Amino acid sequence: MTKIYLAGPLFSLAEQGFNAELARFLEREGFEIWLPQEHEPRDNTARAIFEMDVAAIDWADMVVACMDGADPDSGTAFECGYAYAKGKPIVCFRTDFRVAGDTASAPYNLMLSESATARFEVPFRTKPEEFRQRMLETIRKALAAGRGV
């Protein structure tokens, strides 16, 4: 069973709901998921949260990371960088149709987009089932490719 660390912003109820829904979908598809928001009590220290997340990335076979927002979440960016340094495949996705990259055509910062093994952006008005299918296809592509673009 492939183990996935699911990275992304988790600071609003909407973000937490999206993350949890994606995690349950991937579990139904046979993946083992580590979703940080489900493992870190609010009273943990910053150091404990950091160490837990790093250990979870070490445990995972790959990282799947949400790049939504005006600029992708800084914690998510670190998690991707750490996974890249460890040689793990990374899938980056963006459901936010605003442009947040280094150039007009880039969806987000080039250090994130170029470190991804596979990535995709979701066009405006994409149906949830289309997003889920695209996610599965991209994860499979990344696993087949291993690390690197």
Label each residue range with its predicted role.
Residues M1-V149:
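Conserved catalytic or regulatory cores that recognize and/or transform ribose-phosphate-containing ligands
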